[in-house]
């Protein structure tokens, strides 16, 4: 392997807002949007976030979902219309950033509106997350099904399976107790320490980097960017590959990659 896993530094560092991201979402008018929802007996949490930063953090022993939000807008009038919906719907805790459609501009010349959310949930609860734009970090949940528009997206700790559909921005996934499936538009994909298999169903551009996957690694369709895998417990398969290199080390099972990559890559097989 010629390259170290890019996500390692990310995992070791705290979740930081870059100066560029902060400038993008900073607005002269802000207001708190907080809520607490009883989570006793809840099986899952559903989050619909729009523009803004998002954290979903699993906490041991927690019996409530605690939401700490900050509404931001370039207009006081717009600010009052940014709402937080937090309620129990049967065995689901539902959280929504309610930003009226006519205010969903992303820091254009007229105005900006966003709602940053930090959501603390019972550790291991299943999560369904939909996010528009802005950086997202999810930690210590159960299974996860997520859709993300733009911005970096990280998952650090999921007891079950993880499925992510991502538009643009780097994607980091670590410490997963089940399978991982990804559909990605652009940006690097970094995966580490997966108990199950890792499948990239579709990737437009950007590198794919995986290490410590106990199951198989399967790339069904990759447009451009390098693919590098290390320490795969079962098979490694690339079904369709555009431009970019393929490197692999310590693959225990069968290797099946496009013909043009085989001769120069077979030496990487242990």
Task: Name these PLM-found stretches.
Residues 2, 21-131, 137-147, 154-166, ...:
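Acidic (Asp/Glu) and glycine-rich low-complexity loops/linkers
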Residues 1-10:
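Bacterial N-terminal signal peptides that target proteins for export
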Residues 212:
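Ca2+-coordinating acidic residues in Ca2+-binding motifs
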């Amino acid at each position: 392997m010629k390259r170290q896993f890019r996500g390692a530094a990310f995992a070791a560092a705290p979740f930081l807002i870059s100066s560029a991201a902060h400038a993008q979402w900073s607005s002269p008018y802000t207001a708190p949007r907080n809520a607490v929802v009883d989570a006793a007996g809840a099986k899952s949490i559903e989050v619909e976030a729009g523009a803004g930063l998002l954290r979903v953090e699993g906490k041991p022993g927690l019996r409530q979902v605690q939401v700490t939000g900050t509404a931001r807008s370039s207009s006081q009038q717009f600010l009052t219309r940014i709402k937080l919906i937090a309620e129990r719907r049967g065995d689901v805790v539902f959280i929504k950033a309610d930003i009226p459609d006519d205010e969903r501009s992303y820091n254009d010349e007229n105005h900006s509106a966003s709602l940053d959310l930090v959501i603390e949930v019972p550790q291991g609860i299943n999560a369904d997350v939909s996010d528009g734009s802005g950086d997202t970090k999810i930690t210590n949940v159960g299974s996860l099904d997520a859709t993300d528009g733009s911005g970096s997206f990280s998952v650090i700790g999921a007891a079950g399976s993880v499925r992510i559909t991502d538009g643009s921005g780097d994607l980091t996934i670590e410490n997963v107790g089940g399978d991982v499936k990804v559909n990605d538009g652009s940006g690097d994909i970094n995966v580490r320490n997966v108990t199950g298999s890792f499948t990239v169903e579709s990737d437009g551009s950007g590198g794919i980097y995986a290490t410590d996957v106990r199951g198989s690694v399967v790339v069904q369709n990759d447009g451009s960017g390098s693919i590098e895998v290390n320490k795969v417990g079962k098979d490694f398969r690339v079904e369709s590959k555009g431009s970019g290199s393929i490197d692999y080390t310590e693959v225990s099972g069968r290797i099946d990659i496009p013909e043009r990559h085989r001769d120069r890559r077979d030496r990487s097989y242990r």
